[in-house]
């Protein structure tokens, strides 16, 4: 399962909630994400790696999926996907740019597209303070320009009460994993 959407849509919050609810579920694995950005906040789960080591791991084929966005590199270790053969559902906090690659490598893939209006994205991006002020408009343009379509895509509009949307994400994950 690939969870994607624009910056500020709330992917990390939804996945954090699902991770807490499904922590003891052996049929679900929340894949570790390696990022060339410092992990400064408590609500984002990733392993920090410098760009040189990331590039070496990428060249050695150590990532099952990887991509670049917003001046950073992101990767999911190849080993995270090994459990698919055992019937475990792997949940990846991914990018809209790798949906086709995930479909090709790890079919079938369910894609949860987390969205929110431009106004809400703008508000959240400013509130989290991770982006420079001038970067927010670029992220909003990217949000509008990258689309994901397909029979395997479920859109989750994340504008209302976090708990309601988080419960829906848990239901989707549970449905795929057979929990």
What are these regions (language model features)?
Residues 123, 130-131, 148-179:
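NTP-dependent small-molecule kinase module
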Residues 90-95, 105-126, 156:
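Conserved phosphate-donor/acceptor-positioning beta-strand/loop module used by diverse small-molecule
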Residues 9:
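ATP-binding Walker
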Residues 3:
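Hydrophobic anchor at the beta1->P-loop junction of P-loop NTPases
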Residues 20-30:
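Post-Walker A helix-loop "phosphate-sensing" segment adjacent to the P-loop in P-loop NTPases
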Residues 12:
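Walker A/P-loop
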Residues 6:
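P-loop (Walker A) phosphate-binding loop of NTP-binding proteins
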Residues 33-90, 94-96:
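ATP-dependent small-molecule kinase phosphotransfer cores
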């Amino acid at each position: 399962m690939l969870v994607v959407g624009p910056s500020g849509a709330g992917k990390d919050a939804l996945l954090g909630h699902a991770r807490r609810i499904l922590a003891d579920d052996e049929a679900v694995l929340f894949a570790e994400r390696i990022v060339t950005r410092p992990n400064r906040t408590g609500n984002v789960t990733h392993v920090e790696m410098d760009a040189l080591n990331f590039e070496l791991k990428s060249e050695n084929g150590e990532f099952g999926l990887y991509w670049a966005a917003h001046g950073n590199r992101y990767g999911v270790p190849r080993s995270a996907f090994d459990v698919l053969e055992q019937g475990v559902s792997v949940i990846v906090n991914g990018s809209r740019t790798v949906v086709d690659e995930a479909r090709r490598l790890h079919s079938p893939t369910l894609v949860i597209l987390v969205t929110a209006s431009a106004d809400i994205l703008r508000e959240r991006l400013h509130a989290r303070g991770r982006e420079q002020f001038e970067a927010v408009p670029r992220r909003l343009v990217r949000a509008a320009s990258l689309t994901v379509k397909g029979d395997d895509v479920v859109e989750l509009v994340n504008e209302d009460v976090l708990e309601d949307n988080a419960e829906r994400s848990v239901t989707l994950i549970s449905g795929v994993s057979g929990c």
